[in-house]
Amino acid sequence: MSKKVGIVGYGAHIPRYRIKVEEIAKTWGADAPSYKKGLELTEKSVPPPDQDTITLSVEAAKRALKRAGIPGKKIGCMYIGSESHPYAVKPSGTVVAEAIGAVPFCRVADFEFACKAGTEGMFVAMTLVKAGEIEYGMGIAADTSQGAPGDALEYSAGAGAAAFVMGDKNLVAE
């Protein structure tokens, strides 16, 4: 029988700033009620000027570690999925791993694949735990809105991050 691996801790961070659908529609001369009805949204989260997917990820990761009850140094891998990494050549994961104390032995990589990248990071972390390569791994999904001006995504794609600690002890979800 193979060991069960799953989520042992989770955390999220959503910026507190919001923009109303009416404000976006007013900018483009669009019909706000149509967007509100069609998207079933009234507002979306937006990051302040000093936040990006790295800072969102750090906050979510810290909350996940706290909920799991483990220190950052126990994280053996970290994979961050995003379509809005702030740097082209500097991995977001290296900054987040350093911020939570997971270095120097943490395997780190950034994933890109629109909405799927974060869950792929979780699956890779689970696989490494299941293989006995590491005790705990972390998968993070983080994004800031990337919609083109006037596009439906500009109305609906907000900002936030979710982090999941994967392990084989004290599972909260399989």
Predicted regions and their residues:
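Buried hydrophobic positions in well-ordered alpha/beta secondary-structure cores of metabolic enzymes
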Residues: I7-G9, Y35, A64, M78, ...
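Condensing-enzyme catalytic core mediating Claisen C-C bond formation in acyl metabolism
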Residues: M1-D50, E154-E174
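Flexible, glycine-rich active-site loops centered on histidine and acidic residues
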Residues: K130-F164, K169
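Phosphate/pyrophosphate-binding loops at sites that engage ATP/ADP/AMP, CoA/4′-phosphopantetheine
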Residues: A60-G76
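Short acidic, glycine/serine/threonine-rich loops at helix termini
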Residues: R18-I19, V89-S92, F123, A148-E154
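Acidic, glycine-rich active-site loops and adjacent beta-strand->loop/helix elements
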Residues: H13, G81-Y87, F113-G118, A141-Q146, ...
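Conserved catalytic cysteine-centered active-site region
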Residues: S34-D52, E83-G137
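Beta-strand segments within the central parallel beta-sheet cores of soluble alpha/beta enzyme folds
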Residues: K73-G81, R107-D110, E135-A142, E174
